[in-house]
Amino acid sequence: MIAWLLAVLPATFACAAVYFILSAANPLLGFLWNVAVLYLTLGFRQFSHYYTDIHLALRMGETERARALLGEWRGRSADGLNATEIARLAMEEALVASHRHVFAVVLWFVLLPGPAGALMYRLAYYFFRHWGERRDAEFGAFGRFAGKAFAAIDWLPVRITAAAFAIVGDFEDAVYCWRTQAVRWPDEAAGILLASGAGALGVRLGLPIVESGEVTER
């Protein structure tokens, strides 16, 4: 807990302090600081090119290339997946990534002074992604706290993003899927995002897939 707080909070407070100092000196400097930090914390390019390249490969009939790109994106083997499964998993990854790299970052940017919220969310997500699921003796406690802290920080943004999906898509189906299907996912946040996103888009996500020769229920 202390290690996580020391890693996240000082940087967050320092970011806010720089914003206030620059704004006091010149509002334009504060604005430029906001823009710079927000630009660095947004990660649109970290997922958009994967999604675009995968769908382009599928359209060109290059299933092997699409499979390789998906495996690289997800960090696990995509061997055995057919074109339909690849497209579905790419959509799932894109929905979750759009939230974690764009929508949630912007929301926290708005909630806290200056760009401090955006930086806090990005740091929390970084530690969750790299240590949140580790259970070894050296990093296990840090990983567990990183996971819990990120879940708390992400609680409100997840639901706002899901509501946004519903508003811009099929509202009734999105809300219905959110209420009835999200609880089936082991990852609550991903379940809410994928259920509401699937309902809004009118597609089916979260179906069983074949990974490493075995059927994975999700």
Kindly label every feature range from the protein language model.
Residues 1-218:
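Hydrophobic N-terminal alpha-helices or hydrophobic patches in metabolic proteins across all domains
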